[in-house]
């Protein structure tokens, strides 16, 4: 709760605050309802919940939430490992989540994980991912995010997927990117996507995160590193970088270990040293 409250004062406009998953499956995500009941809710900040299935969606819509995210893996093997369903069954489950969210007047983002590669199957066909994306839009998804679950993406994969999406009729305004920094390609992938017109990116404060069902996965690109980069590229994020760094340091204090974010330690490019 302290971390979410800290983040909600930085200028971020969207925060994925909780996940409605089985506590016995991922203990760290337990207590979603209690968290939502306790956080501050400043104007202009949208709080969403990750849900794996219809049951999770039903629990989420009973709480004070602004939107849902549902994840479907492009890799059948990863889907079985992650949610114990085939990709086809997971797509059906996602359609149910979208319907539940819309019935509750909530927006729903569909996230396609392993969109750039799978730790079990290797390469993932971007045309397959684009076909899944079109199907999810047809089911009513309000936004699409494409997850680089184990940091396998490079600019070549990013361009290939965007080419496939555009060819399938998916506009970049419907696209968000979700990069992990496992192989230190997260930021260059963001620059590549920016150059193609993508303007929405997932990130995690301090670089927290990973996936228990994706061997070798590390956290998402650190939020403060992303904000620093895109501001230096001339984009106005509306986010207070100094406040974001304070949130990253708080996150590090809460988890009790060193986080991989760089800007939280070095500071902005033009921060000078007092002598």
Task: For the regions a language model picked out, list residue spans one by one.
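Catalytic cores and adjacent flexible loops of soluble metabolic enzymes
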Residues: 1-275
């Amino acid at each position: 709760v302290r971390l979410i409250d800290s983040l909600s004062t930085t200028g971020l406009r969207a925060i994925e605050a909780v996940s409605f998953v089985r506590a016995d499956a991922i203990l760290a995500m337990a207590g979603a309802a209690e968290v939502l009941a306790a956080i501050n809710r400043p104007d202009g900040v949208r709080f969403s919940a990750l849900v794996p299935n219809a049951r999770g969606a039903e629990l989420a819509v009973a709480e004070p939430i602004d939107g849902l995210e549902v994840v479907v893996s492009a890799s059948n093997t990863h889907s079985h490992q992650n949610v114990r369903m085939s990709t086809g069954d997971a797509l059906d489950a996602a359609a149910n989540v979208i319907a539940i969210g819309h019935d509750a007047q909530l927006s729903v983002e569909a996230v396609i994980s392993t969109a750039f590669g799978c730790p079990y199957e290797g390469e993932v066909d971007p045309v397959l991912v684009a076909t899944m994306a079109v199907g999810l839009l047809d089911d009513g998804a309000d936004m699409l995010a494409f997850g680089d679950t184990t940091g396998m993406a490079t600019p070549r994969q990013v361009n290939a997927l965007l080419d496939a999406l555009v060819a399938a009729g998916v506009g970049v305004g419907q696209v968000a990117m979700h990069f992990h920094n496992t192989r230190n390609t997260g930021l260059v992938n963001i620059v590549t996507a920016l150059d193609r017109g993508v303007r929405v990116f997932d990130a995690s404060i301090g670089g927290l995160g990973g996936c228990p069902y994706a061997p070798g996965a590390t956290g998402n690109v650190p939020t403060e590193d992303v904000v620093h980069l895109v501001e230096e590229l001339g984009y106005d994020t509306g986010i207070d970088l100094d406040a974001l760094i304070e949130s990253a340091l708080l996150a590090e204090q809460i988890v009790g270990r060193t986080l991989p974010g760089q800007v939280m330690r070095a500071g902005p490019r033009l921060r000078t040293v007092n002598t």
